[in-house]
Amino acid sequence: RIPMLLHELERRGNSLFRWRSFLPLVLVPPALWMGWGAPSWANHLGYQAFCWAVGFLGVAIRAKTIGHVPPGTSGRNTSEGQVAEVLNTQGMYSWVRHPLYLGNFFMWMALVLATGRGSFALVVALLYMMYYLRIAMAEEAFLHAKFGERYAAWASTVPAFVPKFWGQPRSSWVPAGNTFSLRHVIKREYNGVFALVLGFFFLDGFRTWGDGLASWATV
């Protein structure tokens, strides 16, 4: 039964992998709703700056990862599935096996935290783990089938999502084997950065609108 369950999770992960760039859009309506009438402390400049910093930490992680990856690696492919001619083990991949998903987490949470709703942030964090865990399982099954023992040896010493700076084995930085390509980052990431900034502005707009309606109702 366990192998069958793993097979089912892998199958679902492959389906989610193809649509992983679009499925998070289902969070937009509830995030906007939660942002409407947010607690007053969520409007403070310091807290908003913190949320922006969390979001751009995610952008930085993704940029550092993408800027060094060689062509032909497992990456964006929403119609044909996964492609990997090279196994990434250096740069950000020497710290965690899924640095892009770690970056995504910070970008998601930046917008969720900006709503000022702690319970909503907790729910989204749990949904994120359930969502990306299946995608990661499918990706790892694909890479293990492709690269065999080489992949298994690397994966046994590198954590999946959170760098390990204590105990053994401990995450250790291995410099990327190729130079950083800003052009590649801009080509790959401008949509994500635009979506992040647009999300903040939409949340701010809904919050301002909600505050205006509340003030009008008390007149």
What are these regions (language model features)?
Residues 1-90, 106-219:
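Membrane-anchoring alpha-helices and their flanking helix-loop junctions
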Residues 94-108:
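Conserved SAM-binding loop
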